[in-house]
């Protein structure tokens, strides 16, 4: 009957395959198990783990194929201008999935590239489903509906802050 039960947070990728036929488009869905109330949107980024964590190809690790720079004296993969294919979902606090599309994932930032979690950007491109923008009003006070790139930042420029700094 094709039904299944989700009892914890999980991401699934579905596709249809039949010998002698072209495969279907892959469909990705993240299921957030509502064991608590969420007050912020949820960003789901799904890809083959090799794209992020492989020492040779991964953009999210120090790795072995990188370059120096951005405060690093040893080569780091996260310094490379590499794009990796990912599926991006934006889920509202109410549980509504308002964006679900394939995009490119790339590292961003300067010195903050070395700090985890790393900052990254999601870039729309016609190569994926013919969509060259991400369409959603992410910022209620801005008139923008279409975005070519979204940056997810780690607050790296604030890593040196201390409670005392704010109190002075």
List each language-model region with its residue ranges.
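Phosphate-handling architecture centered on phosphoinositide signaling
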Residues: 1-168
